[in-house]
Amino acid sequence: MKKWIAAVTGASLLLGGCMPSFQQEDEVIQENAPEESEEQTVIIPNFQISDEYYRTLLPYEPSPSRGMVVNNLQTNYDIAEFESGLMRVAQQNFDPETHFFQAGQFLDSDTITSWLNREFTDAQLQEYDMEPEENVGLNPVDAGGENREQRAKESPIYLAHILEHNYFVKSEEDESKVRLGGVVLGLAMNSVYYYQNDNDPFGPTFEEPIPDAEIEEQGRQMAQEVLQRLRQMAADDPEKAALADVPVTIALFKQEPRTTVIPGNFIGYASADGGSNELGDWNEMNENYVLFPSAEAQENYRDDETAFLNFKQDVETYFPNFNSVIGTGLYRGDQLENLKIDIPIQFYGKSEIIGFTQYVAGRLVDLFPEYFDIEVSITSINGPEALIIKEPNDTEPFVHIYEQ
């Protein structure tokens, strides 16, 4: 739970448990750059926020598919978790101490868009004036028909987006150079298929839930196909030859429905060694986000729900202008690992903010167990007012009150 550091760097550097790593800044040569025929000079930053974050090669190279994730995923919660969670998946195979991040450079927006399409029938190819080699959509064929609801059940849109991350390592032969050391892809899968009637494209939106087992089955099949396409790209395009021998990890992310206020989660990942066209065994992520308070929390995580409700009640008792307290917990298995709490309140002076923040910080220590991270964000109509961080086994939380 180090995400908060980047947002409050000036204050967070004082925390011993979250001290960044300072190393000598290196200027190195980047080999096998996908968009360049010649080697490029890049810089490895000397600043690493923590051992949970990758250093990014500089100058920052935007992905040729930059911005697509914003349009293709359902909610801002999913967008944030899909990108940050994919880095968490990468750590299973690529050590942040020795690997350096670069936004994906091999899959451009046209490629991703074509892969997100449905597969077309021969008749549809003729109708759209497309060549057979352009029929690369990973989503299933929709052959048409009058029963739109039945078609939605039988052939929903499973795949919503593909996100690529690249990871570089220093060359074993020459440490003044870095080479591509790994590619990580995230496949964002829909948990609900949204559609309109064919004859009323601007009419009401209908929903077709997709069973978890179906999401996983389809996602694994698509992941295997994507791996083979990456290897083929290396054979077809000399500028992408590095894809032939690089280790590849592909992870499946299940989106939440549009109306939810919690993010989706990664459900599994598989990897292929360099040069292999076959993914290995699938590994379950066993992660889940839970809203507090909620029926799910009450049913499955009663002790945590009770602690949260006691905290919520204390906040309501203390402050008459209270609006709401909402929490989002990240579970790995049955264990709560991280709890983020948002408290939006209208204040009428700095003294109120200070007093309320002190009270909340004290209640965190008294009411919640010590084994998980807690982050409390206190906001008003003016923006962020205070941030409270409590890490496992801390006797005192870190508190920052924003100056406005």
Can you name each region flagged by the protein language model?
Residues 33-194, 214-222, 258-331:
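N-proximal, solvent-exposed amphipathic alpha-helical segments enriched in charged/polar residues
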Residues 13-17:
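C-terminal motif of bacterial Sec signal peptides marking the signal peptidase cleavage site
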